[in-house]
Amino acid sequence: MYDTIKFVIKESELDNAICFLEEIPCRISIKSTSSNRVVGFLKNMKIEVRNTTLIVQGSLLKYFKGYNYAECLSVWDVRKSINKLSNELNVPMRQAVINRIDIGICFSMVNVPWVYWDCLLHSDGYFRSNIKQETLYFDKYDSQLCFYDKKTEMKKNREVENLECLKKINVLRYEFRFKKVTSIFGGVVRGADLYSPVFYLRVLQKWYDGYMIIQKGFVSEVDLLRFGGKKEFQRSCVALVMGQFNLYEVCLLYTSDAADERSS
């Protein structure tokens, strides 16, 4: 589910003194440098040092698995990937502030993805735009819903080997992008929160709600994969994800604890 994540951490927030301008450049492939700025990459992750601030941004799934179209990161995989990133940079990324979260899933469709855009009509508070045929956005100041043709994106990125696995199917990807993480979640979110099952549930719920509140239409020429209601939608994708992450048990435990608190 997690895709692009933006980590931001300052030297002053670390328990042990580290100079990013001295420590980071030897651990990455450098693209540009100046007296107080270094930009480079660690695999697919963009690494930027601005004086005493370290910014790391990229697909956590692609960093850990090498691709971001088929599998999801379990809660434990998220923890492993953040620990791996921490070890490679020698910086505790669990302490970093999270400034952006993208969460998404790919769907196998009957038709090419763009023919479904006319069925997704309106979402209150969001500006709908379809500038390019293969992509549909619902945008506002703190978040964005994005529906796009995953295979087209992979062709642009020249992911030829991965495309072989998908050549016989149409792949639609739906992402919910949290642009103002602190505002949406009502407080600072740190790297360690990403592998908290309770926080993962909150993110998943917003991804789910984002799709469900869109007003839907119907195009008779299209054999649309339609979700008849919440139960059908949950069976098709949310249940699969929650089952993989063991989130049903977490949800039941969380609900039980909340009920106990109310009764007491």
Model-derived features: where do they sit?
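Conserved small/polar residues in nucleotide/adenosyl-binding loops
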Residues: Y254-E261
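Structured, helix-rich domain cores that form ligand/interaction pockets
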Residues: M1-L252
